[in-house]
Structure formats: C-alpha cells, structure tokens
Amino acid sequence: MADVSERTLQVSVLVAFASGVVLGWQANRLRRRYLDWRKRRLQDKLATTQKKLDLA
C-alpha cells in the first residue's frame, strides 16, 4: 500500500463525510418535495372526485 500521510487521510475522511452530509441533505429535501407534491395532487384529486359525487 502507498504511504499516505496522516494529514491526507484526515482531509480525505473530512471530504467524504462532508459530501455524505450534503448528499443526504439534498436527497431528503428532494424526498420532502416529492411527498408534498404527491399529497397536494392526491388532495386535489379527492376534491374533484367529491365534487363529482356531490353533483351526481
């Protein structure tokens, strides 16, 4: 194995950790946005269906 200095190891671990945090944060934001969109869409569908039933 190549001789890796302690500093390089610390920096690489820090970079890996930071990228994992950022990636997880972005993925969670995306998931939240998707769930909010789905909820809104289903509520709109429900409202239109209820309107149709009321008119029938």
Swiss-Prot record:
Pfam families the UniProt entry points to:
MTLN
Topological domain (Mitochondrial intermembrane) residues are 28-56
Superkingdom of the source species: Eukaryota
Where is the chain membrane-spanning? 10-27
Quote the tissue specificity entry.
Enriched in heart and skeletal muscle (at protein level). Also enriched in adipose tissue with lower levels detected in liver, pancreas and brain (at protein level). Higher levels in differentiated myotubes than in satellite cells.
One Gene Ontology term of the biological-process aspect is: positive regulation of mitochondrial membrane potential
Q: Is Mitochondrion a UniProt keyword of this protein?
A: yes
Which keywords describe this protein according to UniProt? Membrane, Mitochondrion, Mitochondrion inner membrane, Transmembrane, Transmembrane helix
Annotated protein name in UniProt: Mitoregulin
Q: Source species, please?
A: Mus musculus (Mouse)
Origin organism lineage: Eukaryota, Metazoa, Chordata, Craniata, Vertebrata
Gene designation per UniProt? Mtln
